[in-house]
Amino acid sequence: MARPDMGGPKSSGGFGGPRSGGGFGGGGYGGGGGGGGGYGGGGGGGFGGRGGDRGDRGDRDDRGGEEGGRRGFGRRKVCRFCADKTLKVDYKDQSQMKYFLTERGKIIPRRISGNCAKHQREVATAVKRGRMLAILPYTVGGM
């Protein structure tokens, strides 16, 4: 027996798959059929449901240049541990670990910190070790 809240044969909502017409927003994972468009609802599909009319901004290929709107400024970030082989990830070095935490105590992602994948994993492990030993905070402040 199909439950009415789980996207059964007679249900239009629920958890359904990409083509079932279910989905959180009513249109599967972004199929756009039925209600909204994917998880975010509204729009023309996709996870955020932000497709459809782009208004005054235009599409990426209309912004000029061969790159399709990519911005060409800024320097490529280099992993500081790969650049300087003498540096090691050390959970006991609080002054080094502060560069990889926000003010609230969250680990900074590698697209911002510039770490390579290998060293970002080491940094995350070191931060978690430091948190367990009360060297680094789990969170700062409160509500």
Curated annotation (Swiss-Prot):
Gene Ontology molecular function terms on file: small ribosomal subunit rRNA binding; structural constituent of ribosome
Chain intervals with Gly residues compositional bias: 10-50
InterPro entries assigned to the protein according to its UniProt record, in alphabetical order: Ribosomal_bS18 (IPR001648), Ribosomal_bS18_sf (IPR036870)
Keyword rRNA-binding: yes
GO CC aspect terms: cytosolic small ribosomal subunit
UniProt keyword list: Ribonucleoprotein, Ribosomal protein, RNA-binding, rRNA-binding
Segments of skewed composition (Basic and acidic residues): 51-70
Stretch forming the signal peptide: none
Oligomer and partners: Part of the 30S ribosomal subunit. Forms a tight heterodimer with protein bS6.
Family: Belongs to the bacterial ribosomal protein bS18 family.
PANTHER family attached to this UniProt entry: 30S RIBOSOMAL PROTEIN S18, SMALL RIBOSOMAL SUBUNIT PROTEIN BS18M
Summary of the function given for this chain in its UniProt record: Binds as a heterodimer with protein bS6 to the central domain of the 16S rRNA, where it helps stabilize the platform of the 30S subunit.
HAMAP family recorded: Ribosomal_bS18
Protein's recorded name: Small ribosomal subunit protein bS18
Species name: Anaeromyxobacter sp. (strain Fw109-5)
Annotated gene: rpsR
